[in-house]
């Protein structure tokens, strides 16, 4: 009887502990929020980089100097101009990557568009193409399959090879340390309907900011 009583008394504190308030658990981090914060952490800074992929199509860009400039940042829009130095020493400032937060709740995502301008600031016939994220991605990498608006534009302009495009962007936060990188990649896969595989990838060293370039054309 004493043993039974002791066992019962011994379990009461444990049961009482189980019935007490449980510590709150933190909600899992949203990868897209973390990606956005990482990109925003470089706002105002410019970085050098270059081509790292090896498609023959891009051979003329293999040694080209390249810069990105995380130029403007707010809660729902970030612009990143992409500058390429030509063989004649002049800079092509026609390209700006535009990231936008879209949707809410389960429908939330990130949109990537490519703003292409002529030197006089007017829009190129092929501009504002891109796509929206199809999943949460990771804190470091987000992918953007081509959207229908862009497919229609590519078909209208005779760029049928581009209708299976997938763009991906990788970024490390400013505090990531010695190996922090930004990467932009375009891929096409024959298995997904492309006429041939395509891989274009540029990378930029985020550990060493350089002087910011002039504004991209049209801005």
What are these regions (language model features)?
Residues 125-132, 181-219:
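Edge beta-strand at a domain terminus
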Residues 14-17:
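C-terminal motif of bacterial Sec signal peptides marking the signal peptidase cleavage site
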Residues 100-158:
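An exposed acidic His-Trp-rich patch
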Residues 62-66, 91-96, 123-124, 164, ...:
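Short, surface-exposed coil-to-beta transition loops
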Residues 1-7:
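Bacterial N-terminal signal peptides that target proteins for export
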Residues 19-21:
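Bacterial signal peptide processing site
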Residues 61-92:
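N-terminal glycine/threonine-rich, aromatic-flanked beta-hairpin/loop signature
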Residues 27-59, 184:
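Tryptophan-anchored aromatic micro-motifs
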